[in-house]
């Protein structure tokens, strides 16, 4: 396993996940009867500061349909948690309009690069173009000064 599992931390994440799903109206318990489901949810809500007991609640009461989705969510959260420790692996997000993302993805595909590599290439191209324009402007100015003095 690439990322270490931290039981207390992950139990807190599981608790938050289940509470969020409950508030969104999903059935988080295995019980069909509303009173039994509400009773189990009340027990879960009381376990906020008891991360070790959350896993026991999950084994006993959780809706089996949520098992894989919760595992995926926790796995992704664990990855983000450990990647955030290092600057080079920390992910940043940017807001792009869909059409911009689509064009960037197309360019990346044509170049055989990732989106990040394509963005770096575009920045380098823009910087080189700027340097070239400054150099040409400087040469033009020097040439005009040279021709004007003769």
UniProtKB/Swiss-Prot annotation:
Q: Does the keyword Cell cycle apply?
A: yes
Source organism lineage? Bacteria, Pseudomonadati, Pseudomonadota, Gammaproteobacteria, Enterobacterales
The role this protein plays is: Required for spatial organization of the terminus region of the chromosome (Ter macrodomain) during the cell cycle. Prevents early segregation of duplicated Ter macrodomains during cell division. Binds specifically to matS, which is a 13 bp signature motif repeated within the Ter macrodomain.
Protein name (Swiss-Prot/TrEMBL): Macrodomain Ter protein
Oligomer and partners: Homodimer.
Q: Name one GO molecular function term.
A: sequence-specific DNA binding
UniProt keyword list: Cell cycle, Cell division, Cytoplasm, DNA-binding
Q: Which family does it belong to?
A: Belongs to the MatP family.
**Gene3D superfamilies the UniProt entry points to:** MatP, N-terminal domain (1.20.1270.380), Met repressor-like (1.10.1220.10)
**What cellular-component terms does GO give this entry?**
cytoplasm
The subcellular location is: Cytoplasm
Q: Quote the InterPro entries the UniProt record gives.
A: Arc_rbn_hlx_hlx, MatP, MatP_C, MatP_N, MatP_N_sf
Would I find Cell cycle among this entry's keywords? yes
Give the signal peptide range: none
Q: Name one Pfam family in it.
A: MatP
GO BP terms, alphabetized: cell division; regulation of DNA-templated transcription
């Amino acid at each position: 396993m690439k990322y270490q599992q931290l039981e207390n931390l992950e139990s807190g994440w599981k608790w938050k996940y289940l509470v969020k799903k409950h508030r969104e109206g999903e059935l988080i318990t295995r019980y069909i009867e509303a009173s039994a489901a509400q009773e189990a949810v009340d027990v879960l809500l009381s376990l906020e500061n008891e991360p070790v007991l959350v896993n026991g609640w999950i084994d006993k009461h959780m809706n089996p349909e949520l098992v894989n989705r919760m595992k995926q969510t926790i796995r992704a959260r664990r990855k983000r948690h450990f990647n955030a420790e290092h600057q080079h692996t920390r992910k940043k997000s940017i807001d792009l309009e869909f059409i911009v993302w689509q064009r960037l993805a197309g360019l990346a595909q044509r170049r055989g690069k990732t989106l990040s590599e394509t963005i770096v290439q575009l920045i380098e191209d823009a910087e080189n173009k700027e340097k070239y324009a400054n150099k040409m402007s400087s040469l033009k100015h020097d040439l005009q000064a040279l021709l004007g003095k003769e």
